[in-house]
Amino acid sequence: EKWQLVLNRHEEIRRKLKPHKLRPLTIVITRDIRGCKDVAEKFKAFLKEETGKSREQIEDQVLVIHSDAPDLPRLAGVNNGSSKVEWILSVSMLNEGWGVKRVFQIVPHEKRAFESRLLIAQVLGRGLRVPDGWKGIQPEVTVFNHDKWADDIRHLVYEVMEFEKRIPTFP
């Protein structure tokens, strides 16, 4: 199952982050609000079953983010070292910007949630921020794709990354 693979990768990332004293953060991108709510409920049920954690513990770890989400105010505290959030389920196009500095896995839930250069740039931008106090080699971000559309998304990601490489930076 897809969620099992995503959870396994999340736990692998957790082990790698232990020396840095960081919690892993995975973002799941959905196409719209209805899809976000639906995926969030199914994912929370999956986590509860797989981890044996209580509903309250799962609610502490999972944020659901869209324009009318009750979790939106909690987003501001995700960079706080005491935050228990490890999963963010979000619509692909948010009106408001947000910056989280410990995203290590990005999961497009469906191809349409991730099929334009703008969306990919926006979402990758969330994952390519280096956590505060990070020392050592550059952290990795995993983009988890479905085999059926991985090549299409890989092509768009490479286009975005090539574009990003050509932007000059000045002191």
Model-predicted segments: where are they?
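Helicase-associated low-complexity regulatory tails and linkers flanking the ATPase motor
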Residues: 1-25, 31-86, 102, 112-171
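Conserved helicase core region in the C-terminal RecA-like lobe
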Residues: 87-112
